[in-house]
Structure formats: C-alpha cells, structure tokens
UniProtKB/Swiss-Prot annotation:
UniProt KW Kinase keyword: no
Location of region: Disordered: 24-53
GO cellular component, one term: nucleus
Positions of the DNA-binding region: 54-122
Name of the protein in question: Sex-determining region Y protein
SUPFAM superfamilies: HMG-box
GO terms, biological process: cell differentiation; male sex determination; sex differentiation
Record note on quaternary structure: Interacts with CALM, EP300, HDAC3, KPNB1, ZNF208 isoform KRAB-O, PARP1, SLC9A3R2 and WT1. The interaction with EP300 modulates its DNA-binding activity. The interaction with KPNB1 is sensitive to dissociation by Ran in the GTP-bound form. Interaction with PARP1 impaired its DNA-binding activity.
A GO molecular-function annotation: DNA-binding transcription activator activity, RNA polymerase II-specific
Lineage: Eukaryota, Metazoa, Chordata, Craniata, Vertebrata
Compartmental location: Nucleus speckle; Cytoplasm; Nucleus
Length: 221
C-alpha cells in the first residue's frame, strides 16, 4: 500500500533541496575581484549592529599584500597570521618607490570607484569601550601610616597616626594648640606620640581610640 523509499533517493532529494538555500546565504568576505571588496558587510557590536557597514577602500599596502599574503600562507602553512603580517610589513618597507608606484595607482583607482559608489561614505572607526570607573574608594589598609606636621612656636613637629580613630585624636590635639602654651603642648604631644607608637602594635584601632579619648594631654605648670 505504501511504496518503499530508497535511502539513496531520499539522500539525493535532501541535497537538491539544501543546495539552493546554501547558495543564497553563503558568501565569501574577501575575493580576488577588487570591486567585490566594496560590498556591505554585517556590522558587529555597537552602533552598526544589525545594519550594513561599508568597508574602507584598500590602500596601496593592502593591494600589494592581497596576493602576497596568500603566497606566504601557502609557503608556510604553520605560520600564524600575526607573523605573516609582520613579514609583509617588512617586505613592503624594503620595496623601492618605483616598485610601490603601481600599487598606489591601483589604490587611487579603487578609491575613485568607492567615492562614486558611496558618495556619502564617512569613515567612522569603532572605538573601544572604556572601562567604567567605580565611585567606591578602596578601604585603606590597617598598616598604612599617615603623616602630618603641626606648627608649634614656629617649628614643625611631625605626627604619625594610624586609621581614622587616631586621626580624630590628633585633630583634638591640634585644636588645643591655639589656646595653650606652645612649648608645654609640644612636649606633651611628643610624649603621647611615643606612647601611641608603643601601644599601636598590641592595641586594635577601637581600643586605641578609647584610650586616646580617656587620657587627655598633660600640661605641666
């Protein structure tokens, strides 16, 4: 009642049905015909995404290296594309102006054809996306030391403190300089600075802040 379909006939029918579809969708991005290089190519990511982007006309080096690249690739199948480009660049520099001149003429002809075909063409290079800068500041390490100088009696006295808790204590010390005797205050501050350095190795920042707020500076009479 149902005819038996031969597997060879089925395979041939599938191939005939797929060949036209493949021929309509496939294309070569680069051919030996110079005019084919002006075809529109699909754009990548960015503003040209989903639209057709026109290629730039070839310059003299591109015209010369079009055949040379293929020749070098056939002679050295294991050579990478980056190495081939370096070799072609070196060979191009070694050519004389007379040897380069035919390729400059061909490049000018291709540029004239490009202007006629795309009169409104403007070269818009794709810019790399810049990394976004974070507004968050990295926390300072507990071992980082900040230095500051205080003017007492026309002399600068350096003070070293750790973390924000010690900074607040030194700020209170600086405020007291305006209403106290300069020499006595300087001696007291130097004594407390020596005390802070000896206790900073074993005390945590929280304990050090509590200790500084509980011990006001000593003013000898």
């Amino acid at each position: 009642m149902f005819g038996v379909l031969n597997s060879n006939d089925h395979r041939a029918a599938v191939q005939q049905r797929n060949i036209p579809a493949f021929g309509r969708t496939s294309f070569e991005p680069w051919t030996d015909n110079p005019t084919s290089n002006y075809r529109c190519e699909p754009g990548g990511n960015g503003r040209d995404s989903g639209q057709n982007r026109v290629r730039r006309p070839m310059n003299a080096f591109m015209v010369w290296s079009r055949d040379q690249r293929r020749k070098v690739a056939l002679e050295n199948p294991q050579m990478q594309n980056s190495e081939i480009s370096k070799q072609l660049g070196y060979q191009w520099k070694m050519l004389t102006e007379a040897e380069k001149w035919p390729f400059f003429e061909e490049a000018q002809r291709l540029q004239a054809m490009h202007r006629e075909k795309y009169p409104d063409y403007k070269y818009r290079p794709r810019r790399k996306a810049l990394p976004q800068k974070s507004d968050k500041l990295l926390p300072a390490a507990s071992s980082s030391m900040l230095c500051r100088q205080v003017l007492v009696d026309e002399k600068w006295y350096p003070f070293t403190y750790r973390d924000s808790c010690s900074r607040a204590a030194h700020s209170r010390m600086e405020d007291q300089l305006s209403s106290s005797q300069p020499v006595n205050i300087a001696n007291s501050l130097l004594q407390q600075e020596h005390h802070y350095r000896s206790t900073s190795l074993r005390d945590s920042p929280e304990t050090l802040a509590t200790h500084l707020s509980a011990d006001p500076p000593f003013y000898p009479k």
